[in-house]
A protein has these predicted regions:
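Short, low-complexity, polar/charged sequence segments that are solvent-exposed and flexible
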Residues: 36, 78-81, 133
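Short, thiol/selenol-centered motifs that function as redox-active sites or metal-ligating centers
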Residues: 64-70
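C-terminal binding/interaction regions
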Residues: 1-22, 83-147
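Structured beta-strand/loop patches that form or line metal/cofactor-binding pockets in enzymes
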Residues: 16-63
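Short C-terminal domain-edge/linker segments immediately following a structured domain
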Residues: 48, 78-80, 90-92
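Alpha-helical support elements that line or immediately flank enzyme active sites
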Residues: 72-84
Length: 147
Protein backbone atom coordinates (compact mmCIF):
# COMPACT_ATOMS: atom_id res chain seq x y z
CA UNK A 1 0.00 0.00 0.00
CA UNK A 2 1.27 3.52 -0.59
CA UNK A 3 0.50 4.88 2.88
CA UNK A 4 -0.77 8.38 3.52
CA UNK A 5 1.16 9.73 0.51
CA UNK A 6 -0.75 7.47 -1.91
CA UNK A 7 -3.56 9.02 -3.96
CA UNK A 8 -6.84 9.41 -2.07
CA UNK A 9 -8.81 7.98 -4.99
CA UNK A 10 -7.13 5.00 -6.63
CA UNK A 11 -8.12 2.15 -8.90
CA UNK A 12 -9.10 -0.15 -6.01
CA UNK A 13 -11.30 2.53 -4.37
CA UNK A 14 -13.04 3.13 -7.68
CA UNK A 15 -13.46 -0.61 -8.34
CA UNK A 16 -15.04 -1.14 -4.92
CA UNK A 17 -17.28 1.90 -5.39
CA UNK A 18 -18.62 0.39 -8.61
CA UNK A 19 -19.26 -3.08 -7.17
CA UNK A 20 -21.23 -2.73 -3.94
CA UNK A 21 -22.65 -6.11 -2.82
CA UNK A 22 -26.25 -6.26 -1.56
CA UNK A 23 -26.95 -2.88 -3.18
CA UNK A 24 -30.71 -3.14 -2.99
CA UNK A 25 -33.11 -2.63 -0.11
CA UNK A 26 -34.66 -5.56 1.74
CA UNK A 27 -38.43 -5.82 1.39
CA UNK A 28 -39.26 -6.01 5.11
CA UNK A 29 -36.08 -5.93 7.20
CA UNK A 30 -35.90 -6.47 10.94
CA UNK A 31 -34.10 -3.11 11.13
CA UNK A 32 -33.20 -0.24 8.85
CA UNK A 33 -30.92 2.71 9.61
CA UNK A 34 -29.90 5.67 7.47
CA UNK A 35 -26.76 7.65 8.25
CA UNK A 36 -25.75 10.93 6.64
CA UNK A 37 -22.43 12.77 6.51
CA UNK A 38 -23.27 16.41 7.22
CA UNK A 39 -20.22 17.89 5.45
CA UNK A 40 -20.65 16.21 2.06
CA UNK A 41 -24.25 14.99 2.20
CA UNK A 42 -23.36 11.34 1.59
CA UNK A 43 -26.05 8.91 2.76
CA UNK A 44 -26.05 5.19 3.42
CA UNK A 45 -29.10 3.15 4.39
CA UNK A 46 -28.57 -0.35 5.76
CA UNK A 47 -31.38 -2.89 6.08
CA UNK A 48 -30.66 -6.17 7.81
CA UNK A 49 -32.06 -9.32 9.31
CA UNK A 50 -30.55 -11.52 12.00
CA UNK A 51 -30.87 -15.28 12.11
CA UNK A 52 -31.93 -17.27 15.18
CA UNK A 53 -28.31 -17.20 16.40
CA UNK A 54 -28.26 -13.40 16.28
CA UNK A 55 -25.98 -13.09 13.25
CA UNK A 56 -26.57 -11.05 10.11
CA UNK A 57 -28.44 -13.27 7.67
CA UNK A 58 -29.62 -10.74 5.08
CA UNK A 59 -28.35 -7.32 4.13
CA UNK A 60 -29.57 -4.58 1.84
CA UNK A 61 -28.07 -1.17 1.13
CA UNK A 62 -28.95 2.08 -0.53
CA UNK A 63 -25.76 4.09 -1.01
CA UNK A 64 -25.75 7.69 -2.17
CA UNK A 65 -22.20 8.69 -1.35
CA UNK A 66 -18.86 9.75 -2.75
CA UNK A 67 -16.42 7.12 -4.00
CA UNK A 68 -14.91 6.73 -0.52
CA UNK A 69 -18.33 6.14 1.06
CA UNK A 70 -19.23 3.73 -1.72
CA UNK A 71 -15.96 1.80 -1.36
CA UNK A 72 -16.38 1.58 2.41
CA UNK A 73 -19.96 0.37 1.93
CA UNK A 74 -18.68 -2.26 -0.47
CA UNK A 75 -16.13 -3.56 2.06
CA UNK A 76 -18.68 -3.59 4.87
CA UNK A 77 -21.32 -5.38 2.78
CA UNK A 78 -18.89 -7.97 1.41
CA UNK A 79 -18.02 -9.10 4.94
CA UNK A 80 -21.12 -8.48 7.10
CA UNK A 81 -23.14 -11.66 6.52
CA UNK A 82 -22.60 -14.05 9.42
CA UNK A 83 -21.35 -11.32 11.77
CA UNK A 84 -22.79 -10.69 15.23
CA UNK A 85 -23.92 -7.17 16.22
CA UNK A 86 -20.89 -6.91 18.54
CA UNK A 87 -18.54 -7.55 15.62
CA UNK A 88 -20.15 -4.76 13.62
CA UNK A 89 -19.93 -2.41 16.60
CA UNK A 90 -16.29 -3.37 17.17
CA UNK A 91 -15.47 -2.70 13.50
CA UNK A 92 -17.25 0.67 13.64
CA UNK A 93 -15.41 1.68 16.80
CA UNK A 94 -12.01 0.51 15.52
CA UNK A 95 -12.53 2.36 12.24
CA UNK A 96 -13.46 5.54 14.12
CA UNK A 97 -10.37 5.29 16.35
CA UNK A 98 -8.06 4.55 13.42
CA UNK A 99 -9.34 7.45 11.34
CA UNK A 100 -8.82 9.71 14.37
CA UNK A 101 -5.21 8.53 14.59
CA UNK A 102 -5.80 6.57 17.79
CA UNK A 103 -5.11 2.99 16.82
CA UNK A 104 -4.14 0.35 14.32
CA UNK A 105 -6.16 -0.33 11.18
CA UNK A 106 -9.40 -2.18 11.97
CA UNK A 107 -9.48 -5.95 11.73
CA UNK A 108 -11.90 -5.90 8.80
CA UNK A 109 -10.86 -6.98 5.32
CA UNK A 110 -9.68 -4.14 3.10
CA UNK A 111 -10.02 -1.12 5.38
CA UNK A 112 -6.29 -0.40 5.24
CA UNK A 113 -7.04 0.84 1.73
CA UNK A 114 -8.27 4.08 3.32
CA UNK A 115 -4.87 4.95 4.81
CA UNK A 116 -4.39 7.83 2.31
CA UNK A 117 -7.57 9.40 3.78
CA UNK A 118 -6.16 9.62 7.32
CA UNK A 119 -4.99 13.25 6.96
CA UNK A 120 -8.28 14.25 5.28
CA UNK A 121 -10.65 14.46 8.25
CA UNK A 122 -13.46 15.90 6.12
CA UNK A 123 -13.62 12.51 4.35
CA UNK A 124 -13.80 10.39 7.50
CA UNK A 125 -17.57 10.69 8.01
CA UNK A 126 -18.38 9.21 4.61
CA UNK A 127 -15.94 6.33 5.21
CA UNK A 128 -17.66 5.55 8.54
CA UNK A 129 -21.28 5.75 7.30
CA UNK A 130 -21.89 2.12 6.30
CA UNK A 131 -20.25 0.77 9.45
CA UNK A 132 -22.23 3.15 11.67
CA UNK A 133 -25.50 2.27 9.95
CA UNK A 134 -24.81 -1.49 10.01
CA UNK A 135 -23.84 -1.52 13.70
CA UNK A 136 -26.91 0.49 14.68
CA UNK A 137 -29.24 -1.60 12.50
CA UNK A 138 -27.84 -4.83 13.98
CA UNK A 139 -28.45 -3.54 17.50
CA UNK A 140 -32.03 -2.52 16.62
CA UNK A 141 -32.63 -5.94 15.04
CA UNK A 142 -31.31 -7.66 18.17
CA UNK A 143 -33.62 -5.56 20.36
CA UNK A 144 -36.54 -6.51 18.14
CA UNK A 145 -35.51 -10.17 18.27
CA UNK A 146 -35.40 -10.15 22.09
CA UNK A 147 -38.70 -8.27 22.50
Amino acid sequence: MGGVTAPLYNTEILRLAATIPHHERLESPMASVEKRAPVCGSRVTVDLDLDEEGRVSALGLLVRACALGQASSSLMAANAIGRAPEELADARDALTRWLAGEGAPPDWPGLGLFEPALPHSARHASIRLAFEAAAEAAEHARERQVA
